[in-house]
Amino acid sequence: MQINGVKIKSGYDGKIISVIGAARSGISAARFLTYMGAIVTLSDSASEEKLGAERVAEARAVSAKFIPKATVDEALPENTKFVVTSPGVPKTAEVLQEAVRRGIKVWSEIEFAFHFTMAPIVATTGTNGKTTTTILIAELLESAGLTATIAGNVSADEIKLTLVDAAWNSSADHLNDEEIIVAEISSFQLEWVHKFAPCVAILTNITPDHLNRHASFEEYVETKARIFAAQQDDCLAIVNDDNEAAKNIADGWKERGYQGKLLRFSRNKVYDKSVPAAFVENGVITVRLEAGGENVAILPVSELPQSLPGNHSVENVLAASAAALFMGAKPEAIARGIREFKGVAHRMEWVAEHNGVAFINNSMCTNTAAAVSSLSAMTRPTVVIAGGV
């Protein structure tokens, strides 16, 4: 088949495929599977009323059989080749467990996207710092004259592109050789990955979170670690050496059988020349991509903009700088992109100052570790207005 004059070999023509979950990513996957010639069932356990009129209209606009309030058998038609599941559907869901029991392959939507994208993927996961790091990487690449598309689980208001959308665009449009997909990836999206191997994978940190979804903190950690599992030796894995859970993953790299080239980052350590790393040396953000390689100075920490306050921002900048350098950005372009970074809405967002009082919107701070990092970044007496349960 051809899209925009580009021949696409999908391998999905006439295949029966089930998409579980009629949320944004599920609808996106169903839409593109039908474009590829698959026979698609899009189902959700929720009723039309619970899904809402807008979501139902989007689902019905897809050339797939849409089944709200679906039973397991309705969601898994006979001869289903594989299942694509939305991140909002837990691993323990009866329909997914039944698919496994029947020997049907289950893919997350990012696994599906990876199978047909033609663009390299830079993927960031972690408990905190994902969105800022993702958007910062994209802006650093753009500063270097590269083309970056932000996609995935990004919670910024203006970014609604799923990884499937971005991957499809890279296949359907005559791909610019410099186009790069920069994606934020949640633990939910990593539950059903098998061959997903981003060109660069970043782990910002891991602290207890989402334990209503994951059976234990240990399971949550192992799910996050799956972002590295299929990487090959031409891929880069960037891991926070200052975070205990992330460091433990890095320390067990060979034992886990991981193939990706490991680069540790730390705001507290200066590394021996034998270690690929990103670190602060003499007050300067520094990256060394290769063991025994050159130390590349990016910019002094003192020159980080107001939009990147606190120690946690130094960590984000270290990771983003290493990723951008690996993808071909020059140090001076990276430094320029950092200086010009405007920040992300709802994350230590400077709103205004009145009568000497600064007002900062940090409403995306939803767990203890994020709250501690944010408050530690404050250099003036601080009053916190907090609420919610």
Predicted feature locations:
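N-terminal leader/targeting and accessory segments in enzymes
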Residues: 1-108, 112
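Nucleotide phosphate-binding/pyrophosphate-handling subdomain across enzymes
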Residues: 4-16, 28-36, 300-389
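Thr-Gly-centered strand-to-loop micro-motif
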Residues: 20, 43-45, 85-86, 151, ...
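Residues in the short beta-alpha loop(s) of Rossmann-like NAD(P)-binding domains
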Residues: 23, 46-48, 154, 242-243, ...
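Residue-level detector of alpha-helix initiation sites
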Residues: 23-24, 90, 128-132, 314, ...
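Phosphate-binding loop of NTP-binding sites
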Residues: 34-35, 73-80, 87-241, 245-259, ...
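Beta-strand->loop->alpha-helix junctions that form or flank phosphate-binding loops
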Residues: 41-44, 67-70, 107-111, 152, ...
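Acidic-glycine-rich active-site phosphate/pyrophosphate-binding loop
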Residues: 137, 279-300, 344-352
